A protein has these predicted regions:
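Bacterial Sec-dependent N-terminal signal peptides
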Residues: 1-6
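Bacterial N-terminal signal peptides
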Residues: 9-20
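Extracellular/periplasmic metallocenter environments
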Residues: 25-34, 79-116
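N-terminal edge beta-strand
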Residues: 26-51
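N-terminal post-signal-peptidase region of extra-cytosolic proteins
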Residues: 39-45, 72-73, 81-85
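Beta-strand cores of secreted/periplasmic/IMS beta-sandwich domains, seen most often
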Residues: 45-64, 84-96
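Short edge-strand/loop segments of extracellular domains
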Residues: 72-74, 115-116
C-alpha cells in the first residue's frame, strides 16, 4: 500500500511539474519614469526584453503632463505624481516608444527598446 501511494505521489508531482512548464509565460515588467532626471526624458529599467508580453509601469515624476506610447498602445495622460500600467505584446527587433504630447518627442522624449 505504501509503495502504491509513493508511485501515485511521484506521478502526480510529475504531472504538476509538466503542467507548470506548459503554463503561459509571465509578462516581463519594465518600470518607466517620465520627467526625471530631465522633464522631457524617459528612463526605462530595462533596455532589452524578451519577445512576448511586456508590462510597462509608467510613473510621471515631473511637473508637466506626459503619456507613454509603444506598439500602437498608450497610457492616459499622466499629471505629475501619477502612474499607469500598459500591457503590450512585442515582436523581436526594436520597439519605438514616445510621449505624444505635442513637442515632447521632438524635444527628446522618445527612444527604442530592444526585443530579443
Amino acid at each position: 500500500m505504501t509503495r502504491m501511494r509513493l508511485t501515485i505521489g511521484v506521478a502526480v508531482a510529475g504531472l504538476a511539474l509538466a503542467a507548470s512548464a506548459l503554463a503561459a509565460p509571465t509578462a516581463t515588467s519594465v518600470t518607466v519614469t517620465a520627467g526625471k532626471p530631465s522633464e522631457l526624458r524617459f528612463t526605462l529599467s530595462k533596455k532589452t526584453v524578451p519577445a512576448g508580453a511586456v508590462t510597462f509601469k509608467v510613473t510621471n515624476k515631473g511637473t508637466v503632463i506626459h503619456d507613454f506610447k509603444i506598439a500602437g498602445k498608450k497610457t492616459k495622460m499622466l499629471a505629475g505624481g501619477r502612474s499607469a500600467t500598459l500591457k503590450v505584446t512585442l515582436k523581436k527587433g526594436k520597439a519605438a516608444f514616445l510621449c505624444t504630447v505635442p513637442g515632447h518627442a521632438a524635444a527628446g522624449m522618445k527612444g527604442t527598446i530592444t526585443v530579443k
